[in-house]
Amino acid sequence: MLKHIIPLIPSHRLYTEAFCGGAAVLFAKSPVEAEIINDINMELTNFYWTAQVYYRDLKTEIDKTLHSRDLHAHAAHINAYPEFFSPAQRAWAVWALCRMSFASMMDGSFGYDFGGGMPKKVQNAKDEFTEQI
């Protein structure tokens, strides 16, 4: 779909995405002077902000993450009570829930399979989380 959307975006200096979600368009288009994102889920916008401003802190948390039901439950707790946690902890919770939940849904149950694919999926996501995102 991006191959159809990106050519329709006119030349601009300010880009606003009111319903950010996965931010696919934002990351696929060329960067501009100012980019504004918003989403009904404040934790998503916190994730993108933290990845930009506190990348090292977030990367450290992500690198320590194992595919575990307990960590999934802890991430869900952080997501339910964000006011008690730092931006990096909240961003980690978003990352962990998206990577460890059934169907990658933040409000999904713990995802597992009998073939061992989920731990590999989490490890691959850890390896792919670089400053280039």
What are these model-predicted stretches?
Residues M1-L2:
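Conserved SAM-binding loop and adjacent beta-strand
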Residues L8-I9, A51-I133:
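SAM-dependent nucleic-acid methyltransferase catalytic core
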